[in-house]
Amino acid sequence: MLQPKQTKFRKMHKGRNRGLANGTDVIFGHFGLKASGRCRLTARQIESARRAMTRCIKRQGKIWIRVFPDKPITQKPLEVRMGKGKGNVEYWVDLIQPGKVLFEMGDVSEEIAREAFKLAAAKLPVGTTFVTKTVM
């Protein structure tokens, strides 16, 4: 699963998921899956969506993952009293804002791309829309 090889600090503040999204256009492929809401996307969810898309297109096209989980989420063990420091890192997430392109696909027909993105969207905790590359 995706996670950084090295970070400056092991743990991070909780923070808030506000602001506008970067990466709102399809750049690498011809089709994209765009988020229509805010969420925390975990490494497991990204991997699950990637596998669903790969199986659907039968490894004939190319998939680009435009998100990377670089924020550590900590958790204390069950039935542990408050205090005694911050918990251990349990999983990694990426904060998603509306309009962010999550995945891109190329070298496949539009019907196959739509079907693959539909399967991937079922694995994600946020509403998504299908977008195509606009040529200027």
Swiss-Prot record:
InterPro entries: Ribosomal_uL16, Ribosomal_uL16_bact-type, Ribosomal_uL16_CS, Ribosomal_uL16_dom, Ribosomal_uL16_sf. GO terms for biological process: translation. Keywords: Ribonucleoprotein, Ribosomal protein, RNA-binding, rRNA-binding, tRNA-binding. GO terms for cellular component: cytosolic large ribosomal subunit. The keyword rRNA-binding applies. GO terms for molecular function: rRNA binding; structural constituent of ribosome; tRNA binding. HAMAP family: Ribosomal_uL16 (MF_01342). Binds 23S rRNA and is also seen to make contacts with the A and possibly P site tRNAs. Belongs to the universal ribosomal protein uL16 family. Part of the 50S ribosomal subunit. This is Large ribosomal subunit protein uL16. The gene is rplP.
